């Protein structure tokens, strides 16, 4: 099925979640310093820092709106908590699907970050990963989807993997997204008072649960999810060993043409066989 955007999300109606946004951790150090120096808003350094900061807030806005959206949609069976909603048990998980130090949903293998997800939710037979961006150019985002899709396909082999992409109006390249992706378009985040308030808000510690999700069994913790482990480095070693076992050729090219290997190629962006 394809989830449809609501008017509330499309128009970024956030009056009821503004206080919640102050509970998230932000990297405001650079922007705060520029504001204190009265740096011109036309300076490249200011524009870059401001755009990045607004992108952080936008991600949290959409996440908050998706929490409410989840309660409205019977098709959504579970939604992964992160940020100020996560339980302290998540901090003891060091590998696999977890919440990292910056309160993001990531997959780690031997302390290596494989992929990061802005949000994850499950339906009866599918897993949706959510990506949010305020950049009007979507080429790099589109390119990153393949790795995320491949990883989730490996660790959740029985589920159909889909993506929900949330962008702002005026974004380009929307028709270039893969068929498994649903694209939502919202208004730009332009609440200057809110943005300024968050810039100078007291820094929040990532390891504290300061908000409580609504009492609903749909909301789940990352540490409770069952999935198939993906050992990043042992798998890489296995690929390198198997591809050399052809009786006639130094490299078995046919081995690389299997469907499973196509998923691995999306995860291992560079593979050198010397």
Regions found by a protein language model. Name each.
Residues 1-274:
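Intrinsically disordered, low-complexity Ser/Thr/Pro/Gly-rich regulatory segments
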């Amino acid at each position: 099925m394809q989830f449809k955007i609501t008017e509330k999300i499309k128009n970024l109606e956030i009056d009821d979640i503004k206080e919640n946004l102050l509970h998230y951790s932000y990297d405001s150090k650079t922007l705060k310093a520029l504001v204190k120096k009265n740096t011109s808003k036309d300076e490249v350094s200011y524009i870059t820092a401001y755009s990045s900061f607004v992108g952080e807030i936008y991600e949290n806005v959409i996440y908050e709106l998706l929490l409410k959206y989840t309660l409205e949609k019977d098709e959504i069976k579970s939604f992964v908590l992160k940020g100020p909603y996560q339980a302290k048990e998540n901090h003891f998980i060091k590998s696999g699907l977890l919440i990292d130090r910056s309160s993001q949903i990531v997959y780690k293998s031997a302390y290596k970050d494989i992929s990061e997800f802005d949000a994850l939710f499950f339906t009866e037979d599918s897993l949706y990963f959510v990506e949010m961006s305020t950049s009007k150019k979507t080429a790099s985002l589109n390119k990153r989807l393949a790795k995320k899709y491949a990883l989730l396909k490996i660790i959740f082999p029985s589920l159909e993997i889909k993506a929900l992409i949330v962008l702002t109006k005026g974004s380009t390249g929307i028709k270039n997204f893969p068929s498994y992706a649903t694209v939502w378009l919202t208004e730009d985040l332009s609440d200057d008072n809110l943005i300024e308030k968050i810039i100078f808000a007291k820094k929040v510690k990532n390891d504290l649960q300061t908000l409580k999700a609504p009492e609903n069994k749909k909301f789940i913790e990352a540490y409770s999810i069952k999935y198939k482990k993906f050992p990043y480095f042992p798998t890489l070693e296995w690929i390198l060993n198997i591809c050399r076992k052809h009786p006639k050729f130094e490299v078995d090219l046919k081995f690389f043409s299997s469907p499973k290997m196509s998923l691995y190629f999306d995860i291992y962006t560079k593979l050198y066989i010397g």
